[in-house]
Amino acid sequence: MYALHYRVSVSLVRAIIQRESNWQPCAVSSKGAKGLMQLMPATARRLGVRDSCNIEQNISGGVRYLAWLMRLFHNDLRLVAAGYYVGEDIVARRGLSYHNREVVSYVARIRATYVLQAGMNDGLEKSASKKVIR
């Protein structure tokens, strides 16, 4: 499992998939993001994902991206979720802008889904990562 290999919370991966694509493997957003984890084309290319509708490639790329964001933002779930949603450059420059309701709402939904998933995946979580997610 990619989450275990990259030391990313299984619950976080599931929360992202739930909120991004509602588990639709070939979902395409109005902005052009594709697949379960809704990878933007440039991000997919950067991660070596050739076919974003391929479940294995999409999840592998999405989990690697989350692992990278977790390192960049020191495991702060709010910043990781915001970075996943609007891009790491914007979050690195501005942090969390509480003037942007859309980003704040997305982060809140990810956190709520994460907490719910963590309760259901307690055994998987303990083996996935020892990192603390705030």
Placement of each model-derived feature along the sequence:
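Catalytic glycan-binding domains that act on GlcNAc-containing polysaccharides
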Residues: 1-134
